């Protein structure tokens, strides 16, 4: 799933269609990386630990510094692609998906369509499996409560507060800075317009794709160039994944802190970049950001047995987490698309109205 989602997303990203679209893509990628970086440092400042089974063995074999992390990363990047798929070496899968995705950008439209169809088919299979998640969640909650008592729910609450806090911080603090850089005026009227007209709808639909028509209608009402937003809004639903980057990073950091694995600044930066890149493949399936957590955990030598427990914890808090994540992702598509075009207006001396 990771392989085809990321490869399809990058191959269909296409080439720049002008200065505005180039600016939008830069804003998308920068905001996603920034979200991951902020999530890492927020997790360091407000550490949260979870209750995980079979954690001791993983902690004993985990890397103890940046040298071991880089060694693991390098060996996984150059892993045989077939071996990476068979043995679930997520970093190797991601590296090959990126290389092939970029290579396929010059392929025929029929080839790109085939990649999209395959990724959608795999997504449907995974979605069917996810629909059975409540049964697994029931078992996980039962095991956690019988092992650790009702205080388990306090841990889940702290984790949820950290996730939502990071997402709100991105939307109300860092995104306004990006908007101000574009328009050189008070960004909050535009921030709240996108919040009211786009984020609320996305919160309840929990689907960036379903919110595309809403965002395009708002762009039309603001008088934006249709040739631009008809490209940037659907593209944003694929690669602008601030919320997904936060989810992957926070959940991975919580796992690392639970296992007592040390994380220095260089390792944190690598995790941020990896999470931002992985987030590009999170749009193809409901709860996609949670399913990419094992890939980030593999950077620290954490086994699938442990990382999939973390995914299960994510599904427990997923109703709120996924809703807020989608609201951030989709409203940011609108916000950054509009900001990039308003920047062009400002440079041309046109009046900016929103």
Which residues make up each language-model segment?
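Hydrophobic transmembrane alpha-helical segments of multi-pass transport and channel proteins
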Residues: 29-33, 37, 164-169, 202-207, ...
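Signature of multi-pass transmembrane helix bundles
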Residues: 19-189, 350-354
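Membrane-interfacial loop-to-helix junctions in multi-pass transporters
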Residues: 88-92, 126-131, 165-166, 183-192, ...
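Juxtamembrane helix-boundary/capping and inter-helix hinge elements in multi-pass membrane proteins
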Residues: 9-19, 105-110, 148, 184-187, ...
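Transmembrane alpha-helical segments and their short flanking loops
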Residues: 51, 250-354
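Active-site-adjacent helical/loop segments in soluble small-molecule enzymes
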Residues: 1-5
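Helix-loop-helix junctions within the multi-pass membrane cores of secondary transporters/permeases
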Residues: 197-279, 336, 347-350, 354
């Amino acid at each position: 799933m990771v392989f085809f989602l990321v490869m399809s997303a990058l191959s269909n990203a296409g080439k720049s269609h002008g200065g505005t679209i180039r600016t939008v893509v830069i804003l998308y990628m920068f905001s996603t990386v920034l979200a991951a970086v902020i999530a890492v440092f927020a997790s360091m400042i407000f550490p949260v630990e979870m209750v995980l089974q079979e954690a001791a063995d993983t902690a004993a074999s985990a890397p103890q510094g940046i040298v071991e992390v880089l060694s693991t990363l390098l060996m996984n990047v150059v892993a045989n692609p077939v071996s990476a798929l068979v043995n679930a070496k997520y970093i190797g899968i991601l590296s090959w998906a990126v290389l092939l995705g970029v290579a396929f950008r010059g392929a025929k439209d029929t080839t790109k369509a085939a990649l999209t169809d395959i990724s959608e088919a795999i997504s449907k299979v995974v979605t069917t499996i996810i629909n059975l998640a409540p049964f697994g969640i029931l078992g996980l909650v039962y095991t956690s409560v019988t092992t650790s008592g009702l205080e388990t729910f306090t841990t889940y609450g702290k984790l949820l507060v950290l996730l939502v806090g990071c997402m709100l911080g991105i939307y109300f603090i860092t995104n306004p800075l990006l908007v101000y850089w574009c328009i050189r005026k008070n960004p909050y009227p535009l921030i709240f317009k996108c919040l009211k007209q786009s984020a609320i709808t996305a919160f309840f639909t929990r689907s960036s794709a379903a919110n595309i028509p809403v965002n395009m209608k708002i762009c039309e009402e603001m008088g934006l160039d249709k040739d631009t937003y008809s490209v940037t809004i659907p593209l944003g639903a694929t690669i602008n994944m601030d919320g997904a980057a936060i989810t992957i990073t926070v959940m991975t950091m919580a796992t690392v802190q639970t296992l007592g694995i040390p994380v220095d600044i260089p390792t944190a930066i690598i995790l941020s970049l990896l999470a931002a890149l992985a987030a590009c493949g999170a749009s193809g399936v409901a709860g996609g950001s949670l399913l990419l957590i094992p890939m980030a955990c593999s950077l620290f030598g954490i086994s699938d047995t442990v990382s999939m427990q973390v995914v299960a914890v994510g599904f427990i808090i997923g109703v709120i987490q996924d809703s807020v994540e989608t609201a951030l992702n989709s409203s940011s598509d609108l916000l950054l698309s509009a900001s990039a075009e308003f920047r062009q207006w400002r440079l041309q001396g046109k009046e900016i109205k929103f």
